[in-house]
Amino acid sequence: MEIGTEISRKIRGAIKGKLQELGAYVDEELPDYIMVMVANKKSQEQMTEDLSLFLGNNTVRFTVWLHGVLDKLRSVTTEPSGTKSSEPNIFESNHSSSKSSSCVSDERRREDTLPPLAVSSTRSERTDSRVSTSSQEQRNTASRQSCEDGSASRLMSTVKPLRELSPSEAVIDIKPEPDDLIDEDLNFVQENPLSRKKPIVTVTYGSSRPTAEIYRPPASRSADGSLQVHRLPQQGNLQGNRQLDTQSCRSLETVQLCNPEAFGSLAESYRPTSKLSADKVGSEEEGSRKRRLPIVSSVVKVKKFCNDGEEEEEEDDYGLRTGSISSSVSVPAKPERRPSLPPSKQVNKNLILKAISEAQESVTKTTNYSAVPQKQTVPVAPRTRISPEESHLEVIHLQSRLPALCSQLQVEEPKEQAVEGIQGAEQKELSSRLQVDPVIEDTLQVTQDYYDGESMVHTDTRSFILKKPKLSEEIAAQNQQLGKRATEAMRVLSGRLIQTRDQIAQPEKPASPKFIVTLDGVPSPPGYLSDQEEEDMYITEGLKPIPQNICAGKGLKGLRAQQMQIVTRQLDSSDVEMEQLNVLQKQEKVLERCKYWPACKNGDECVYHHPTQPCKVFPNCKFADKCLFIHPNCKYDAKCTKPDCPYTHASRRNPLPSPKPVPLPTQSVSSSSPLCKFFPACKKMECPFYHPKHCRFNTQCTRPDCTFYHPTIAVPPRHALKWTRTQTSE
């Protein structure tokens, strides 16, 4: 029963490892489900059909592997001599069955005479002996170094349980961990030798107990690569060993080496002591005796059942006498974490690399924005007022462009020394700067630089976009083709960003084409305006050209005293004009009181009028609830039934039913006979005159055009109209 449990546990671990290898999502239920199918002896086709939902394209591969393992297990189980060791050989090595049989037969012979030893991976008790494993091959360091360098092959090895008389002997269990059964088809030594490597756990103990020399028979097992450890029998208690668990003993196997020639000189030394000192763990200098091969193993100790005080004292005395290192522990590395998602659902590495490269390119790449030729953003400084005496000259350089439809003016301010040196030759310099350019769009850039820092507090830096200034007649005399098509025009729209959409021409001046632009009396605007406000200001703004009498003979000094043209804008009245525009915009709303006020959700965006001032003629206001001013709230609010209530109703009132129209009595007279003058009180049954027919609805009739008669008095009840025979006296 215990053998079957161990085999089932290992089969289940192998199935779980294979599922993780295939990339399928593994939980505790799927391996159990597969084990149930194995127990039910499902065929390969049935398993493929049932597991296709979970494994997808890997179903066939998994079922072929599983049935191959089961077939090996059945073939080994049928052999009578290999019953107890067949299953570990399937899961841990790929040796032939004959090799396994030889190892198992020896194990069976030992099991008949010796009790099993319990193996515990979590015990911290002491062991009492030193085990030394060696081989008969050459013992040189070169072979050991070649083993460490050529550690491409992976070892899956266990040491057979040592059958001896003493219960205090140590047992070396180099046993594969459950995670090691995950790799390719349980024989990954040949398929993927470099896939996963773990350092071996090496524990070195010091002891004063005599050691049993371990020998190898010269001719018994030299052909195969397995090392069988033999010990000389020592004294012990056989009855105590019988009580140990036998399940772990069956899982112990012989040491199976992939390359026995290369690893023949390996040795393991274990010196048990009474204590494990954590402070002396760093003594890694004894690496010559430690194997750093990729062997996944665990070294365990047998729990000591006999309390020998003398032995403990001897161990303590030996530790103090020799001063050797008590222990040296090397912990195995943490196994690599495998992804739980299948490869088809995992993130593609190419996409991640592509995203990283695109992000780096976007960071390093600079974006080039195309310049807008019509608009220019200019910072506006606070208001500065400069006296005309301290203002400097600004010289405008004209650059005309063929086909002579537009020209570009650049207003620059020369320094004081340059102004003094240039007299009559300035106009020739201006004409020499005229250039040919077929571009039609032109701008005027006015740059003002002020150098006198004592005469002002702030520097007013503004840029103006003017529309197509034209040349004067004097430049036309120097260059007739340009002078015929150019006119003088300047327009200063604002100290902000403004684009002109039409061409405003000013009267031509017969003087030099030098323009002086000043900002006297122009306050700085409070901020930037929207496009709509700029358009409104453009409509309402006006230019104020101030002509000056110019003496051409005075040169630039005369121009400084008498400015040829000053373009100013009256911003003082701009606030009033904006208020008027706001009033006009408000007047554009429908002059009708909002019927949802004061509960209107649109607020100021509502196109209807919302009252803001109280009505002065209330309660004599004749507009009632349609008044454009505020009336007091009605105390009945929505329950008010008065149709012409002058008060304000916050809630919407229910419309009252319209009164029923009273039908007018028809006065139509028959053409044949006149209307009876006693109608409707006529009681003569044979009256020849016309009696109108009564309406069947009587006074309840609601049709205004009803042609039947509607009495104005109440009709007598039905019982009053009942005829009775008159009583005759006898």
From Swiss-Prot:
Would you name any one GO CC term?
cytoplasm
Checking Pfam families in the record gives: zf-CCCH_2
Where in or outside the cell it occurs: the entry states: Nucleus speckle
| Disulfide pairings | none
Zinc fingers, C3H1-type, are found at: 588-613, 614-633, 634-649, 676-693, 695-713
Top-level taxon in the UniProt lineage? Eukaryota
Q: Which GO terms describe its biological process?
A: mRNA stabilization; regulation of mRNA stability
* Biased composition regions of type Low complexity, renumbered to the chain: 93-104
Family recorded in the similarity comment? Belongs to the ZC3H14 family.
User: What is the stated purpose of this protein?
Assistant: RNA-binding protein involved in the biogenesis of circular RNAs (circRNAs), which are produced by back-splicing circularization of pre-mRNAs. Acts by binding to both exon-intron boundary and 3'-UTR of pre-mRNAs to promote circRNA biogenesis through dimerization and the association with the spliceosome. Also binds the poly(A) tail of mRNAs; controlling poly(A) length.
* Full protein name: Zinc finger CCCH domain-containing protein 14
